């Protein structure tokens, strides 16, 4: 439901909310095809797509997440933009979607082999972070099943309306505007920073905010990029938070038809260079087909970038494979290639 009451009054006071909607820092047309919304959507739905879904089951690792030592700093990716981070004893779950990423059960079906994890597989979550309200990042079925095992929700301004409506304790919901922060105690702080995107679960857009986040722990600085196109906010984050340990960046579901709201391959390279993080995890791929590009193109582009610049620290794990943040693990090669017969 739409924000209301005190939450809506706070939205009205936001410097990022103007003329009835949240706005990006710079002009950001959602579509750049020149063909209009309906024509662009028609092309997306009905134009022939080359290999936008794999023809084989993707290899994945089923890890017993509840058995992981919470003191071990690690990241486990669940495909698309869902992942678990453990940092200095804090368990952080980001944008969990363990069901169909769509209001329609037959649309946005996960690729074969990628639907390995369910809400019941998750350990107790200290911090649930939602970057925006799109269906592939905020899933009712998933978060309500996690409700009783979640300590605190952190989300952009306005998104808390969903959680309150879905039965979460308002005292455990922290909504942040760009430039705001929340101290969690014990040396943990979450900072809300811009992203270049949009929001909405219906035809009315931008009534809630979208964001990136920086999570600071006693030993880690972690950038959660969320969704969005390239802009100056990556360099701004790097200046404010030098020596990032980890950056999780969108890599996939892009198109020249919407180049300002999802990063193109060349934009990923620029964002990696701007942030200068020690390790980079490209996500937003390998589970759903939300664009016309070949399903493995984002992985191949990231692998090429890693080969071109080994110092970039690009990590491409399999779904469900724990990656230790305190050391350079040896990971499998191009796991996404089709198995030989």
Label each residue range with its predicted role.
Residues 98-115, 200-204, 255-261, 289:
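Acidic/histidine-rich helix-loop elements
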Residues 139-148, 290-300, 326-327:
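Metal-dependent catalytic neighborhoods of phosphoester/phosphodiester hydrolases
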Residues 1-109, 115-121, 156-226, 245-251, 301-320, 325-328, ...:
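Metallo-beta-lactamase
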Residues 82-86, 183-243, 259-267:
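Catalytic core of the metallo-beta-lactamase
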Residues 85, 95, 132, 139, ...:
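Divalent metal-coordination and catalytic microenvironments
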Residues 6-20, 122, 127, 152-161, ...:
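Cap/insert and terminal regions of metallo-dependent hydrolase folds
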Residues 14, 106-154, 174, 242-248:
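Active-site metal-binding motif and surrounding structural segment of the metallo-beta-lactamase
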